[in-house]
Amino acid sequence: ANKKVEGSTPFARSKENFMSDLSEKKCIPCEGGIPSFDINEIHKYLKKVDGWDVKQDESKNFYLIKEFKFENFINSQKFINKVGNIAETEGHHPDIWFGWGYAKIKIFTHAIKGLAESDFILAAKIDKIPNA
């Protein structure tokens, strides 16, 4: 009844399943008092989101950033409206720039001036938007 698939284990997960675990979590509001992720934690979580880059600002604080491409202005606008709806639902608000054919999203936790799990949760939820 139980067939063993070559090269798999009961704990093997596809990247999609690994990401969906994160996208199904809820952002937890941060009022400070917790440390921001260190570079090892950042790299662990970065594997769970698709195409996001980690950068540092002038104060050496880490943030996530990703640019999305679209065919025209209206599709960019529709996308950022969906991002805005997710942000409001989650209570976690990214910085957003958009124009003809693109939208750029920057995510970090303001209260700790760095990255926390909620930032990666929001990134995973944004990645689930159709045509993102």
What are the residue ranges of the model-derived segments?
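Long, contiguous binding/interaction regions
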Residues: 19-74, 81-132
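Short, Lys/Arg-enriched N-terminal segments with co-localized hydrophobic residues
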Residues: 10-18
